[in-house]
């Protein structure tokens, strides 16, 4: 009779099997993620060297995370606590909802057992850039731990200043700013209870991804003024939600009516210098454009806004001409790669060459998003 297989041997066998399964899983990496980063968190697989006790966000934790975020935002936006009397009320802060794609990317990164954030491009999704906060607890976490964490975040607001609301800078607390960022309205998180290989200690980690990302240098965290007075289109607030057969659960927050469409501003957008393209790419005359070369520009309406996308094959080239030059602003479009070229001289155009070696000889350009052009 053979001796029983020891527990360490079983663990090694299970780990080996897990690595094989993750190699198979990681072999599939959607093209958009590849274009953002060859180390995209969705695609890099998990760490086999850390022992995992639990993984994945439970239905209860999913609801709790959304509730805790919205409770904190509501207290600030609606001024419903003496602890935030020094901060202005918010006119445009959105109610957060759960996002499965953000959650899946966050879970993939959490499974790496890294105890640090991934890179911005590593977690980006097609609809928007993604912010991130990691909540970490020693040992096993319970519901009170998460409540206490958000209570400490709330108390930290006492040191958050009015001028920091008006303009985000490097000195602003980034976690507080991201939680309060008015235009961020989608959240998805990953959960892992594990032994960290670096010191052998047990931790519980919740990685939360936020979109559209906040903490944009020079921009306001939220717009100060009368509560809900600048709620964007496709949102409602308070009793106004009843006519849409919706219930406003959080005082002072603008609730998105159709979660498949973006909330878009009902006031003119103030240019910040961060725009790639200041145009909603709708059908208004001042947004019209013509294309020379590869005509694969596609208008996509997403939860992150309206995008004009193009995909170029090897050696492809496209030129897009926009009728109104005052709608254009430029930023570096593909850091680390060849940038598209703006040309002037009677025309306002964007010339985009394909770059070999980038995404397998492929290049994609997104021209973004923002409110529709105004007559």
Swiss-Prot record:
The keyword Disulfide bond applies. Its main location: secreted. InterPro entries: CAP_dom, CAP_sf, CRISP-related, V5_allergen-like. Expressed by the venom gland. Keywords: Allergen, Disulfide bond, Glycoprotein, Secreted, Signal. GO terms for cellular component: extracellular region. It is found in: Secreted. Residues 66-210 form the SCP domain. SUPFAM superfamilies: PR-1-like (SSF55797). The keyword Acetylation does not apply. Belongs to the CRISP family. Venom allergen 5-like subfamily. PANTHER family: CYSTEINE-RICH SECRETORY PROTEIN-RELATED (PTHR10334). This is Venom allergen 5. It comes from Lycosa singoriensis (Wolf spider). The lineage of its organism: Eukaryota, Metazoa, Ecdysozoa, Arthropoda, Chelicerata.
